[in-house]
A protein has these predicted regions:
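Short, low-complexity, polybasic intrinsically disordered segments
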Residues: 111-115, 144-145
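C-terminal edge-of-domain segments
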Residues: 142-160
């Protein structure tokens, strides 16, 4: 079994009056992230990390901001497409570790909902998704509340194209998680 690691980083400017999408949910705040899509910085770094781990370039290559079809798009749709691309190449998500850097609002209360939404979109167990939040202690653009940054590291495993497709076409999530654990021990 081939194991690969990917890393993602993204920033978005914060602007008053925009909705603030983070981890697939709308977080109540006076400012939202500015971007071509819904500007969900957490989903964007997860997409970049997954694509990078599989050596499939980056989110900008697959969903360019010059293409009007992605204007205002829900980033969950981008993540679902990244997973489809990844699985077509025979990869499965092992785990995701991510960090959101933001002064305000405090996002820790929203992390459980983010994990639930992301797990559902990706077809993985919530235990495979770690989301942490921190500030920059009032330093830099994040500290001045001008923007939001996020980082993600992912681990993916090569399970083969046929198995990856079979895995997600016919098996319920609970059985997929049990089978994935068994495969890790066997391979």
């Amino acid at each position: 079994m081939k194991i690969r690691v990917g890393f993602g980083y993204d920033v978005h400017q914060l602007q008053e009056g925009l909705p603030f999408w983070l981890g697939g949910i709308e977080v109540p705040h006076t400012h939202g992230a500015l971007g071509h899509s819904d500007a969900d910085v957490l989903i964007h770094v997860i997409c970049d990390a997954l694509l990078g781990a599989a050596n499939l370039r980056d989110i900008g290559f697959h969903f360019p901001d010059t293409d009007p079809q992605y204007k205002g798009i829900d980033s969950k749709k981008l993540l679902a497409e990244v997973l489809r691309i990844l699985r077509a190449k025979g990869y499965e998500v092992g785990n995701i570790d991510s960090t959101i850097c933001l002064e305000r609002p405090k996002v820790n209360p929203h992390i459980p909902a983010m994990r639930t939404v992301l797990a559902e979109v990706m077809g993985v167990d919530e235990d495979a998704i770690s989301i942490k939040a921190t500030t920059t202690e009032k330093l830099g653009f994040v500290g001045r509340q001008e923007g939001v940054a996020a980082y993600a590291t992912v681990l993916i495993t090569s399970v083969g194209k046929a198995l990856a497709c079979l895995f997600h076409s016919f098996l319920p999530l609970s059985l997929r998680c049990q089978l994935k654990l068994t495969l890790h021990f066997l391979l």
